[in-house]
Structures are given as structure tokens and as C-alpha cells.
Amino acid sequence: MPVLRARSEREGHALVEALAAGGITVMEVTMTVPGAVDLLRVLKTEYGNKLLLGSGTVTDAEQVVATIDAGAEFVVSPSFQPEVVAKTRELGKVSIPGALTPTEVITAWRAGADYVKIFP
């Protein structure tokens, strides 16, 4: 799955257009992209259900709410944050926290993570 990193919302939009034109239908828009929430909202409006969009580098429950409200269907976080998993699940979306050690993976799984991303 492509992880979108860009220097601006405009650059991010251009990258998504290129990926979609190439047949990619699932992508993660990271919160490191300036205007990431607005970009998610614009992409959801433009592409509707043609793209499965998620938010990445999400580190707190406020970002979970903002990105899901903007159209994210899944939430990826760089580490296991219980409140991120809980809020994502509460809102009915897929939670994918990052973890590295076996203990972190098991802890995330037991907390309700749908998937665990081995990271870094």
C-alpha cells in the first residue's frame, strides 16, 4: 500500500492522481502532509468509493476523529497508543498501530487492533 508523503496538499493531490491513474485503489495519507485532513476530505469528495483512503502517522484521538470525519476508512499509527485504537474502533473503522517487539504486537492485538504494522 502506498504511503503518501508530500511537502504540500497540492503535491499530495498530484501524487494521488498519479497513483489512481496507475490503478492503485488503496493509499495512506500521512498526517505529516501539510493540510492532510483537508486533502483527505477533497480526495473523498473527488473519488468517493473508488479509493480506499486511510490516515497515517496518527498519534492521538483528536486526529482519529478529524481524519475519519474527513473520509479515512482506516487509521495507521507509528506506535501503539491505546486511545488511538479505542477511538478508531469506537468510530467503526480499521485500526493499524505500529509495533516492533512481540510484546508490543500482542498488547496492540489484545487492545483491539485489527492489524499490526511492524514498524519501524
Please identify what each model-predicted range represents:
Residues 35, 50, 59-120:
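Conserved anion-binding
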Residues 1-74, 90:
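Conserved N-terminal beta1-alpha1 strand-loop-helix module at the mouth
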